[in-house]
Amino acid sequence: MVFEKIDKNSWNRKEYFDHYFASVPCTYSMTVKVDITQIKEKGMKLYPAMLYYIAMIVNRHSEFRTAINQDGELGIYDEMIPSYTIFHNDTETFSSLWTECKSDFKSFLADYESDTQRYGNNHRMEGKPNAPENIFNVSMIPWSTFDGFNLNLQKGYDYLIPIFTMGKYYKEDNKIILPLAIQVHHAVCDGFHICRFVNELQELINS
């Protein structure tokens, strides 16, 4: 893992960062419809497939890898790792696991299945211990679909990393649609960036 510190004085987002981080702290969320027909028709496992696809786009663009590290420094990670929740039916609680990214889905799926098998019965909130600092959070609410979703981070205005939440998929006009909520910090991510993410995610799923 490499964390490259940002020189704010030469950074092209300096005035935007200062405005949305300090003057007017601002996070926002967008909920979009993702066409997952190709995933279902190929018989791929939905959750790990979406984790993989989301991670691929996150790691393409620096705005989704920009963070304040544990030393309070602003910078960009060279890679982000998905941290995802699994649900425990017996206690109605969840645990967070994480799986390192791989360049191909087959390898990622093997590691994902290994992690869920090894740590899936650990009912602690941190199901797989020793999560690295370069993680981003993904969760799924498979019991209901939604048109809007928002996380309220009362003390989280210094949290720059995106958060992804998926809902229950449904059929619409011969397509299978998955709601996806994306929460970002305006200091590092504008509407253009989140829309580019959505478009590239859909293109990757369709390819």
Swiss-Prot record:
SUPFAM superfamilies: CoA-dependent acyltransferases. It is an enzyme of class 2 (transferase). It comes from the Bacteria. InterPro entries: CAT-like_dom_sf, Chloramphenicol_AcTrfase_AS, Cmp_AcTrfase. Signal peptide: none annotated. The keyword Transcription regulation does not apply. Pfam families: CAT (PF00302). GO terms for molecular function: chloramphenicol O-acetyltransferase activity. The active site is at H186. GO terms for biological process: response to antibiotic. It catalyses: chloramphenicol + acetyl-CoA = chloramphenicol 3-acetate + CoA. Keywords: Acyltransferase, Antibiotic resistance, Plasmid, Transferase, Transposable element. This enzyme is an effector of chloramphenicol resistance in bacteria. Homotrimer. Belongs to the chloramphenicol acetyltransferase family. This is Chloramphenicol acetyltransferase. It comes from Clostridium perfringens. The lineage of its organism: Bacteria, Bacillati, Bacillota, Clostridia, Eubacteriales. The gene is catP.
